[in-house]
């Protein structure tokens, strides 16, 4: 039957080459789907079902076990079950304390609507400032958590803090499951998923910050990004049926939008993803229709996010929107020419140039007409980071000194090498990248790709999902080599790509094709290696790292900070309810969470006004006069000043990166570069001088509380000068 129907199909192709391709592929899918029950033996169907069932069970189990591991480790580290509420809250440091404090505020609100209104018109957090906390701090996770806590009746079963961290740990389990599924989809075996999870957990110092800062936005957002990438991987596969394609598209749409709502920097990651898809389409490796369907998801998510994020201008001026709009315009201007011809190659180059030019032009136009203040400090930081500008600005230099914003250290590469992750990742990346280049050159020369690539072909670079991941991981890795904090986005996909490679017979077959192996049957050897290599890696990881993981769970650690507990207790008992506190932003976040009192600054770095406040408040550790400090504090209506001994007497490993050094540089009290003049301040360091209790400091400030770590001063409203 198939042979008799062959010639008419070819005639139809000649008459209607465009429409018939889709029809023929659809027919082939239907034909391949229908006969399976008739031709495939029952034991083959059972094997397929068992493989899928075991893989799904392993993926879900891996996610659940990881979530339980995080919960147990957190309990051992902070001993939550034996702590009072105040001691538990102190474990939330910096910006994490701010996020959790708003979760508490939502639970205390008389109704959900009232709670949302108070957050969107918040004037009880920062003095002299009304902020839309939901928009500015992306508090949608806290809104959702508070709804779930009250709607499910969990307030009668579990404490709010356990419910909150339980949701985050559950999301981390979903994160691991999504990575498992992605590696499984790419390699065809769930063994790759198991190896991905093993590498992820072993290298968790470099894969996640969940152990140190639970409420961080990335801990809420990245699990959805992992789900989006898993769906995109399935969507790009060429052998996916119609129902699978629809499911992947719907999952990708939902996860993309959720990811964008959870994290203010999500559109930058999606921008890198869009670049990867653009390059995939440029080299004609994937059907343009599929790629442009993904672009539609970006546009839908951006505009829906813009509306639901209180008309957030950052989304309108984002490079993602400019790039997608440029790609859509370029598609409208594209000409239909014969693929592989010289004219087609020229048009490809012109199209690439057109997209780049339109992206930059549209972004400039949007920034001209859309008022925005978002991420201006980020551009300044990048200029200083890459040496395009020099500055003595305290905030910029302080950011440069942060470990997460510096280049990766040697210890980072050593850890990845010891776990065998880095060597196998480099091997897999090189093979996939070279195979991808072969495909690109083949397309440039006008050669068409095979509709179905078999194992014997040894062409792993012809698979669109593989090429996408290669491009994406190269982009992420390049950025992570400059800013170490981006490793938490890159390394999880390093685990996934390395595990896929060593478990993929196609990758080994591609390597054997290049080596022209003839002594042993290459297909048989590829199948053996795809099972043996991950098994050997897994056994070695089990032997070396499993005892360490068990030891961590057995050790009972203790987070002990009595000085901070005493400070918070004193504030709650002695300070007036309307008091405003000034101090380091990190401490102010803890005060906001533990006491609810108003503060002058917050540990947030996405607002220019807050950054300026932080710099001004930090002047209490500089060589400024008592009068200058008094004027700064009273300008923010502060009533109490808290001096931290750890900052005032800081002995940092890097001279020039201590807070007091950065302040001296900004104020011109220290040599910064050759040629700079050293100016001497006639005043001592304020944080030292104010402790001595002599005039004029006692005229402006009265010490009301102190312990080993903190000194609290009341800012006098009536100044009495003493001789």
Curated annotation (Swiss-Prot):
Transmembrane regions listed in the UniProt entry: 52-72, 161-178, 184-202, 222-240, 260-280, 292-310, 316-337, 349-370, 421-441, 466-486, 489-509, 522-542
Subcellular location: Membrane
Residue ranges with Basic and acidic residues bias: 18-32
A GO cellular component annotation in the UniProt record: endoplasmic reticulum membrane
Enzyme Commission code: 2.4.1.-
Lineage top rank: taxon: Eukaryota
Reported tissue expression: Widely expressed.
Record has Membrane as a keyword: yes
Keyword Transferase: yes
PTM sites of type N-acetylalanine: 2
Keywords: Acetylation, Glycosyltransferase, Membrane, Transferase, Transmembrane, Transmembrane helix
EC category name: transferase
InterPro entries: Dpy-19/Dpy-19-like, Dpy19L4
Membrane-protein topology: Multi-pass membrane protein
GO molecular function: mannosyltransferase activity
Annotated region (Disordered), positions in chain: 1-33
Membership in a protein family: Belongs to the dpy-19 family.
The protein's role, per its UniProt record: Probable C-mannosyltransferase that mediates C-mannosylation of tryptophan residues on target proteins.
Name used for this protein in its record: Probable C-mannosyltransferase DPY19L4
Gene name of this polypeptide: DPY19L4
